Amino acid sequence: MHEKLTTRFAPSPTGYLHIGGLRTALYNYLYARKNGGNFLLRIEDTDLKRNSKEATKAIIEAFKWCGLEHDGEVTYQSERFDLYKEYVKKLLDEGKAYYCYMSKEELEELRAKQEAAKERPRYDGRYREFTGTPPQGIEPVVRIKAPQSGEIVFEDGVKGEVRFKAEDIMDDFIIARSDGTPTYNFTVVIDDALMGVSDVIRGDDHLSNTPKQIVLYEALGFKIPKFFHVAMIHGEDGKKLSKRHGATDVMEYKEMGILPQALLNFLVRLGWSHGDDEVFSLEDLKKLFDPYHINKSASCYNAKKLEWLNAHYIKTLPFEEINRQLKDLGFDLSVYEKAGFLLDLLRERAKTLHDIINGAKSIVNAPQNYDENAVQKFVNKNNLELLQAFANTLKDQKTGKDFEDFTNDFLEKKEAKLKDLAQPIRIALTGSAVSPSIFEVLEFLGVDECKKRIDNFLKVRGK
């Protein structure tokens, strides 16, 4: 029987979800969806001292915001300690693992000798075949009997064949600490095997864990999954992405007014491509994504590309979706009359959702203040008189075309040019010299509101 392709994302809730983690989750999600498989979410919360409930909540919220739906319930490792203990006991009973009674002082002494001899620090296996009486007062750790020679070889979906010499990297590593808690590599193997994970896509910072995990898969008699190790995301300076390159927490992007569609599109392209295409919907990606086409080299974070993609999605997504995202930021466009027209007014220039919010407020609400720099630059006695005449002549215009035709006729009669009038109108209506097409703003506000705002501006500035 052909097994169902199953991937997983397994973050540790010791901090908020980083965009590198979201990219890993996205790759796993897309590969599962393309193949009709399962995408699982596992929270690796065995570090009870460092775990944060807020971080766990933020991870799940980020998934919801991005529309990455996992299959089944979330698995929490902290609820599976009894299961891990069963498998530690199994390996002990089969002679594949053993208790090690080395004290902390003995370990430090061994490490100091190895460093003095310029040897790689490693456990020397002194309790590997121990059958004597255990020393008093020592709570033992449990170590796996790892191979001491030969090679560990696997075919990585991104990097190709990867080889590790056992003697160079391996010692009898710990699978259970002295307090009985299992170690990271041990829990990962147990869970991936029992959850039916067939394919593991993860950052290449996990590459060094892979030979240890393969040793455990073989010792436990589990099938080894297919591994794909993805190069890290770098900043534009070529260094590992960090806070100094900008936001790294996924939910910070939401607060910045970035759409999830734009962020996912941006992240998938950091390491994967499909021809020269730049824009992909999530539905497109479910059909096209192939982890075997992930680049081997690190990808470079490009803030301008994210901004460009965000502007694209603001221009093209339907009103309902844009407004749903705006509501998450505490702003509901639908409460305004002609809300769809207002969005269309604003979306052509907008780079973030905050541009929509600020633009809507500046148009819908009559200005309380006027940009002084804009006034000094664009307003003078002559065009104040022109503006007054313009307002007095407005009558029954309704569409942007009506306002444009009327304005052109008005300027021709006054022997003036659009540049003499456009910015004063813009400032009078919105308080700023920056706005969408002035004729569309006139249409949105209507003749009565336009006259009212121009009159108010003239009262304030005409003193």
From Swiss-Prot:
Pfam families linked: Anticodon_2, tRNA-synt_1c
Motif residue range(s): 'HIGH' region: 11-21
Q: Mind listing the GO molecular function terms for this protein?
A: ATP binding; glutamate-tRNA ligase activity; tRNA binding; zinc ion binding
Q: Does the keyword ATP-binding apply?
A: yes
Which Gene3D superfamilies does this chain map to? 1.10.10.350, HUPs
The EC number(s) attached to this protein equal: 6.1.1.17
List UniProt keywords, sorted A-Z.
Aminoacyl-tRNA synthetase, ATP-binding, Cytoplasm, Ligase, Nucleotide-binding, Protein biosynthesis
Q: Name one GO cellular component term.
A: cytosol
Query: Which positions does UniProt annotate for ATP binding?
Result: 243
Catalyzed reaction equations: tRNA(Glu) + L-glutamate + ATP = L-glutamyl-tRNA(Glu) + AMP + diphosphate
> Where does it primarily localize?
cytoplasm
Q: Where in the cell is it found?
A: Cytoplasm
Show the InterPro entries listed in the entry. Answer: aa-tRNA-synth_I_cd-bd, aa-tRNA-synth_I_codon-bd_sub2, aa-tRNA-synth_I_CS, aa_tRNA-synth_I_cd-bd_sf, Glu-tRNA-ligase_bac/mito, Glu/Gln-tRNA-synth, Glu/Gln-tRNA-synth_Ib_cat-dom, GluQ/Sye
Top-level division of the source organism's lineage: Bacteria
Q: Does the keyword Protein biosynthesis apply?
A: yes
Question: Motif 'KMSKS' region, which positions?
Answer: 240-244
Question: An example of a Gene Ontology BP annotation on this entry?
Answer: glutamyl-tRNA aminoacylation
Q: How does it assemble?
A: Monomer.
Family assignment from sequence similarity: Belongs to the class-I aminoacyl-tRNA synthetase family. Glutamate--tRNA ligase type 1 subfamily.
User: Its biological function?
Assistant: Catalyzes the attachment of glutamate to tRNA(Glu) in a two-step reaction: glutamate is first activated by ATP to form Glu-AMP and then transferred to the acceptor end of tRNA(Glu).
Q: What is this protein called?
A: Glutamate--tRNA ligase 2
Which organism encodes this protein?
Campylobacter jejuni subsp. jejuni serotype O:2 (strain ATCC 700819 / NCTC 11168)
